[in-house]
Each structure stands twice: as C-alpha cells, then as structure tokens.
Amino acid sequence: MSEKQFYLLQVNDALFPIGGYSHSQGLETYIQRGIVHNVDTAREYITHKIKWNLAYTELLAARLAYEAAEKKDLQELLYLEELLEASRIPMEQREAARKMGSRFAKTIEKLGLSIGETGIFREYLDARKGKAVNHCCIYGVFCAEMQIPMEEALTHYLYAQTSAIVTNCVKTIPLSQTSGQQLLSGCYGEFDEILKDVMNRSEEDLCLSAPGFDIRGIQHEKLYSRLYMS
C-alpha cells in the first residue's frame, strides 16, 4: 500500500479535523418531526440521501473537480465553485461546505505535503484566497494532485459520507451501534450503481433537484433546539 493511499484514508477518516460531526445536513429536522424514528425509516432516509442528494451534489462535484484539476483547468475549478455556491439551496449547508473546505485546506497545508506549495492545488487555493472553498471540490483537487485514481477517491468519499450519515442516525434517533453497522453494510449494494451513475453524469446534473432534503435543510434553521449546525 502506497503512502498516497494512506493519505486517502486519512482525509476520509472521521477524525480528520474538518468538523463534519457538527452537521446533520437536515437529518435533525426529519428526526424532530418524527419522519425518521427507527431502523426502517433510517434505512429509507439513508438510501434516498446517498442516491438522490449526495450522489448529484458532493460526489458529482468531487468528480468534476478531480477532472478539472487533472487537466490543470483552473478556470473550470473556479466556475465549479461558483456553480455550487449558486445551486446549494439551504443556507446552513452552504456554510457547512465552506467551513469544512476551509478546514480541509488548513489541515493539508499543516501536514507539510509538497502539493501545498506548487501545482494546481496551490493555484486553486491562491485563486480562492478570501473566498470559500467547498469541501467536495478541494477533496477532488487534492486527490487529483496526489495522483490517487479517481475511482478510489470517489469510493472512499462515498463510504465516508455514508458512514457519517449512519453515525448521525445512531446518535440522534437513537439506534444501537449494531443497528448502525447493519445500516451501513446494507448500503454497500447501492454503492456500485451510485458510482457508475455519477461517472456518467455531466455538469448539467449537478445539484439535481431534491426538494424534500432542501426543505428540511431550510427548516433546520428555525428548529427550537438543535444538536447540529445544519
């Protein structure tokens, strides 16, 4: 196993300090309204979330960012950032993506990797100086600059994000740890289809409408009590 593969594991680890644990991406609204309240409803929520929301937003954006970085196309990366800013409707989720992207960049720079000094990764960060970077975009650029195969990068990202959703369900509904592991492993059969679909999508499909998730994300802003920032 090469060093770059260990870095891939590291940036997708739940302990990587980008603050992802602080965000439920609207799940908290579903739980407070009693829509997601047990294992069965959690399974339905997670399946729909990864197939119709995560796939066409973060996962597709990571792929597009990877491809643009691979071509050293800085203008395409900057356009993708602006497109995501305009297309992601819930305010809290836009802010979450910015914060996690900023923390990702700062952590990578402190690791002392050579990619933090030259190349498209540095050009991209310099061009976005004073502006936000989306977590999924900077992740794609990082993986391209590290020459991590795109399929591996997207697979690890999909697993990590799904695991985070399951963890939020376990903590907030709440569910048992065993139920959480069963929910997570139950998603594996969907992963191959999701990844194939994302590889066949274009920029026009980015942030494909998922109104239910958007509405719950917006409603989260007005919840009386909250454990999560989004």
PLM feature spans:
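Glycine/small-residue-rich interface belts in oligomeric ring/scaffold proteins
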Residues: 4-72
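Internal, conserved structured core segments that host functional sites
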Residues: 59-64, 68-143
